[in-house]
Amino acid sequence: QTLELEKEFHFNRYLTRRRRIEIAHALCLSERQIKIWFQNRRMKWKKDN
């Protein structure tokens, strides 16, 4: 799961709603979980750069 999310993040730090729904379905997670993961990941990215 994390690997898939990291790959997606590498290509695109911001998700469209449609992409978020696709990822949520593919990984059996809720849209909210995906949204929060990306928010957290962006904060981590910002901190590291």
From Swiss-Prot:
Pfam families the record matches: Homeodomain
Subcellular location(s) of the protein: Nucleus
Major subcellular site: nucleus
Alphabetized Gene3D superfamilies for the sequence: Homeodomain-like (1.10.10.60)
SUPFAM superfamilies (alphabetical): Homeodomain-like
GO cellular component, as recorded: nucleus
KW Transcription regulation (keyword) present: yes
Coiled coil region boundaries: none
Origin: domain of life: Eukaryota
GO biological process: anterior/posterior pattern specification
Family annotation (CDD domains): homeodomain (cd00086)
DNA-binding region: 1-49
One Gene Ontology term of the molecular function aspect: RNA polymerase II cis-regulatory region sequence-specific DNA binding
Keywords, ordered alphabetically: Developmental protein, DNA-binding, Homeobox, Nucleus, Transcription, Transcription regulation
Keyword Transcription regulation part of the UniProt annotation: yes
Subunit structure: Forms a DNA-binding heterodimer with transcription factor PBX1.
Purpose: Sequence-specific transcription factor which is part of a developmental regulatory system that provides cells with specific positional identities on the anterior-posterior axis. Also binds to its own promoter. Binds specifically to the motif 5'-CYYNATTA[TG]Y-3'.
Family indicated by similarity: Belongs to the Antp homeobox family.
Name by which UniProt lists this protein: Homeobox protein Hox-A5
Lineage: Eukaryota, Metazoa, Chordata, Craniata, Vertebrata
